């Protein structure tokens, strides 16, 4: 898994290719197409690889009497139930068409999380390149089967899951991909709270997913700031997903735990800087180290004047900077050899000074 083989446009864990960054607009458009368009422009400006929305119909997603999660109650007090909140956050099919066209025209990949089979079929009709499975649907076996039957790349978030639940999800989709599963599936570690505390992140679980299932992994981040997603890249994440908003003060469930456009841009730059810092993994001096190496390493140097033909003893030598001459590791080959010319004390010995 350390090769540079692409996984449907996404790098495998441990490769030297760039991380796939998803700017998660989610429902931060508040049901407003113009605000959704602004999010597409901002995602492109940030340097992210994709902008992602959410595709659902409240009528087929949630019972009308289900209460909201605690963070939803705190962040979106204007609605009394999940249904009421989500109904106001729907995008129409026409909205999706327009957002997809805008993203394509800007050169940023359009993505959306479809929450049911009909939404998945609609997204495929829009030409999406991959499907994103949200954490809440990971135990929805009929839905997983429907998604996998499309034979598109899958990104599965694993928030609120234990390993056995992830294993069942993988076993559900695997028959549709066979031995090519690792070319199509990326698992995202995730903590499903908005915002997630550092204590709850448990980022090492991302590595556990990679080790347990031998699949590419990434991280869907709900913490505040850029530390955790940047660290995840250093730990091998090939996908990073991060919520962003045009304005954190807007009403709605996810704005407070989202980045503003400038922060999103900073995150993308931080990830790209992290990739640069990680490098290729090959242990060798950098081009900028080579001049310094010559100055701070030692060479075999004459301690006293010697004439041509003199046999060199250990007492004739001292090891001094710079390291432009014969290396100290060759001293056993130099002691007992003879000079090919007259040399003065302080001369940095070169091989041309030694008789063949």
UniProtKB/Swiss-Prot annotation:
Recorded superkingdom: Bacteria
Which Cys pairs does UniProt list as disulfide-bonded? none
Q: Which residues form the AFP-like domain?
A: 299-356
According to UniProt, the reaction catalysed is: 2,4-diacetamido-2,4,6-trideoxy-alpha-D-mannopyranose + phosphoenolpyruvate + H2O = N,N-diacetyllegionaminate + phosphate
Q: Does the keyword Lyase apply?
A: yes
EC number(s) on file: 2.5.1.101
Protein's UniProt keywords contain rRNA processing:
no
Q: Record's Gene3D superfamilies?
A: Aldolase class I, Antifreeze-like/N-acetylneuraminic acid synthase C-terminal domain
| InterPro entries, sorted | AFP_Neu5c_C (IPR006190), AFP_Neu5c_C_sf (IPR036732), Aldolase_TIM (IPR013785), N-AcNeuraminate_synthase (IPR020007), Neu5Ac_N (IPR013132), Nonulosonic_Acid_Synth (IPR051690), SAF (IPR013974)
Keywords, alphabetical: Lyase, Transferase, Virulence
Q: Which GO terms describe its molecular function?
A: lyase activity; N-acylneuraminate-9-phosphate synthase activity; transferase activity, transferring alkyl or aryl (other than methyl) groups
User: One Pfam family of this protein, by short name?
Assistant: NeuB
Family matches, as SMART domains: SAF
Per the UniProt entry, what are the Gene Ontology biological process annotations, in alphabetical order? carbohydrate biosynthetic process; glycosylation
User: Per its UniProt record, what PANTHER family does this chain match?
Assistant: N-ACETYLNEURAMINATE SYNTHASE (PTHR42966), SIALIC ACID SYNTHASE (PTHR42966:SF1)
| Function according to Swiss-Prot or TrEMBL | Involved in biosynthesis of legionaminic acid (5,7-diamino-3,5,7,9-tetradeoxy-D-glycero-D-galacto-non-2-ulosonic acid)(Leg), a sialic acid-like derivative that is incorporated into virulence-associated cell surface glycoconjugates such as lipopolysaccharide (LPS) which could be a key determinant in the ability of L.pneumophila to inhibit the fusion of phagosomes with lysosomes. LPS contains a majority alpha2,4-linked homomer of legionaminic acid. Catalyzes the condensation of 2,4-diacetamido-2,4,6-trideoxymannose with phosphoenolpyruvate (PEP) to give N,N'-diacetyllegionaminic acid.
Q: Supply the name of the protein.
A: N,N'-diacetyllegionaminic acid synthase
Organism equals: Legionella pneumophila subsp. pneumophila (strain Philadelphia 1 / ATCC 33152 / DSM 7513)
Q: Which gene encodes it?
A: neuB
